[in-house]
Amino acid sequence: MSKVTVQDIEAVDDYWGPTFRSILEGNNTKQIGDQLEQRIRSHDKEIERICNLYYQGFIDSIQELLQVRTQAQQLHNEVHSLDTSLRQISASLIQQGNDLVRARQIESNLASAIEALKSCLPALECYMKFTQQAKNKQYYQALRTLETLETEHLTRLKTHNYRFATQMQIQIPIIKENIRRSSASDFREFLENIRKFSPRIGELAITHTKQLQKRDINAIIAEHMQQMNGGEAGGAGAGGDDDGANVSAQDLIDFSPIYRCLHIYMVLGQREYFEKDYRQQRRDQAKLVLQPPPNMHDNLEAYKTYICAIVGFFVVEDHVKNTAGDVVTSSYLEDLWSSSLTKFVNEISMSSSSCTDPNILLRIKNLIMLSINTFKCYGYTVNILWELLHNMRDHYNEVLLQRWVHVFREILDKEQFLPMVVQNTEEYECIIERFPFHSEQLENAPFPKKFPFSRMVPEVYHQAKEFMYACMKFAEELTLSPNEVAAMVRKAANLLLTRSFSGCLSVVFRQPSITLTQLIQIIIDTQYLEKAGPFLDEFVCHMTNTERSVSQTPSAMFHVARQDAEKQVGLRICSKIDEFFELSAYDWLLVEPPGIASAFITDMISYLKSTFDSFAFKLPHIAQAACRRTFEHIAEKIYSIMYDEDVKQISTGALTQINLDLMQCEFFAASEPVPGLKEGELSKYFLRNRQLLDLLILEEWSTYFHDYGKQENRYHLVQPQSIIVILEKIREADKKPIFSLVRKNDKKKLLETVLKQLKHIADRQN
């Protein structure tokens, strides 16, 4: 470091730090300071020398400078004046230049703005168009415009990065969703309107079908020619004749929402979703439409609204199928129709089965017929509806039968069941017109004329024809052949007469107020009604335009009623016989009988004679049956009167009196009280009584015991136990003093012996 010189320090150009560090770290600071002093003095001398050398030149220069100073000042003034003048002159130019620059800049900016606006204008115009379309609910067109905006215009503006374009790009999905929701809302409103107007649409479709059914081919051709020749004027005139004739579903319902919604979902790529949603919504609506209103069974308007709503529903579906592509497919519609038809048939069947008004049922049938024809016009299968009508026909006939039961009851309640008498020709002809009856004897007879039947006969015959006509009304247009219709009407008529009317007659038969004479007249009336059966069949043939075919023999029509009547005749006579026997008043301890039959027997026989004579020739079979039943009952009464538990004693005289009464009855039976009976047929009913009384009176005990158990037995109908009961009553009577005096001891012994033997035989039988 000691070797460092001032020259070394001066030679350092870059960084003096190391040099100063070495100086400070060394011990030769004083030496370096001396060197620096010497160096400074050397430089001062050099400066002085140079100054002395150039001093004269400097003085000269100063002098020249002083000389130039005046000129410079003058020049300065001139320059300043010139500058001021130039400034004044150039100020306007500078202003104009600046204005020109600004104008050029504005012009450039305007050109750029115009160019930018030109590039943005299609997008803005497209957006304005979309906004207007959306405001007018032209959603499909709006989506198309939005698609153009998104795919064309906004794509071109991506490079410019406009904020409004970016905002539009962000808003487009939201706008699409809003459009979808708005169109879906319109679609829901459309579905609600469809549901509301379905009954009206169905009613118009049914009305149109009804009008078409009334028109023939000539009228259709004439109308077509009129439309061809008359053009629009003719069409307008035709439309004015009938306000609702040409109104269709699209006239009542605006179907544009479904088309718009379909197109919107197509643009959004959600067509399949829309189709599924539409079908599901319509299925749900079908369930609501198929729900019948409450208390529909007896409300015709409810039936009409219900049926029209279903018809309108499927008319709308058919229209959508034909106009909206695959929204309603054939398979979907067939499936919906099949399930809905089954539900519809079940509801109508259940409701109509509770209906008891044939007029309502007939109108329901007409509504269903019109709906069938309407459905057929739209291509729907309706076979199950025909089955429904056939089932309703059976129920309708049953309802008619119930109604005619009330009609018959009213007729029978008012009837006196006496032969009808007419006073003049007008009344006579009125009866002949209402009932097919011809009798020359009656026709030639003078007035007043007496018919063999009561007023009930023509009334019932007329009501039977009315019933047939009512049955025929329902069978019209049921795709049945005339023979099938005729068979149906005959079957219903047979049920009417054999079941309903016969049932009413059976009720009348059992009325206590009906006398035997009236009962017999009713039976006679039924015979005339049976004879009128072929005329009823002829009436059926005339209504159905078929050949005559008797389905049931007239004699069998009131078979059940006649059996009941025969039974009632027998019961009435037997009841009268019981009244006579209540007057018997036998003296069971009679010693000697008067020798004649009892008075009640004589009165009873007189009654039976007059009774049988009154209808034996009119009703021979019934008279014969009643006669058999009567004599059987008399025999049972005579037999039971001896075995009455209240009768404790029977004298021989009492037995003789009973024998006289029995003989009187046997004589009456042998006198053929009713023609046509076999000889001895009635006497057999008294045979048991005869054998018993003969055995008791004749006392042929040896014969009885000898023949007992053999085939040829004179007293084969008399059982030992029966004889024992009577003999014990005779023995009790013999205990009386009046009989003890006259009865011999051997008679008593004989009676005891007979009783022992009879009891022995009875014990063996047991």
Curated annotation (Swiss-Prot):
Tissue: Detected in developing rhabdomeres in photoreceptor cells.
Main location as per UniProt: other
Cell compartment(s), UniProt: Cell projection, Rhabdomere
Pfam family, one: Sec15_C
Gene Ontology terms for molecular function: small GTPase binding
Subunit annotation: The exocyst complex is composed of Sec3/Exoc1, Sec5/Exoc2, Sec6/Exoc3, Sec8/Exoc4, Sec10/Exoc5, Sec15/Exoc6, Exo70/Exoc7 and Exo84/Exoc8. Interacts with RAB3, RAB8, RAB11 and RAB27.
Family: Belongs to the SEC15 family.
Protein's UniProt name: Exocyst complex component 6
Gene: Sec15
